[in-house]
């Protein structure tokens, strides 16, 4: 699977090379996430995200962008006086966000697109102990996310970006297996703040 992802990204790089002058870079940052459909709420699970990207012009002010991104998602609840329950879920993914960007000016842009992902592994624990990986609904090996964000060029090389992404399909079923209308299971809801190093 790692070879497949690398091959896909290299193909995008090759297409960009022959189609238009391309730009690229790498990035790192933090993610804050929750799982919609569980019994916990709030963007309390903090994780890491990092990767690389390429981009190229379409018709100004539009550009396309493709990333290869490692990202941690999940859910977290800290114990308190009122609630002794503790819960932590950390899910590790590789994503390939495919984005369209609209530049408002030379420094500020909006972006939106889809991001196929591959589930790598997870760790789940409560106030008692680690929860075995085979306990509860299985995680879907492949997923799809929809995302939108905003970015700002601090300098010609440094960009700060904020993006929200949401599972377009459930990342796993409800523990009960029940579904209702559009609620088909549990969904990742993630905010990612990243610092990009950009080169041309």
What are these regions (language model features)?
Residues 22, 61-64, 108-110, 156-160:
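Repeated loop/turn-to-beta-strand initiation elements of outer-membrane beta-barrel proteins
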Residues 23, 27, 150-159, 185-200:
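Outer-membrane beta-barrel "beta-signal"
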Residues 26-28, 66-68, 98, 112, ...:
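Membrane-embedded beta-strand positions of outer-membrane beta-barrel proteins
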Residues 30-34, 70-74, 116-120, 164-168, ...:
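Transmembrane beta-strands of outer-membrane beta-barrel pores
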Residues 36-41, 76-83, 122-130, 172-178:
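Outer-membrane beta-barrel translocator domains and adjoining extracellular loop/strand segments
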Residues 54-56, 102, 118, 152, ...:
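Residue-level signature of outer-membrane beta-barrel architecture
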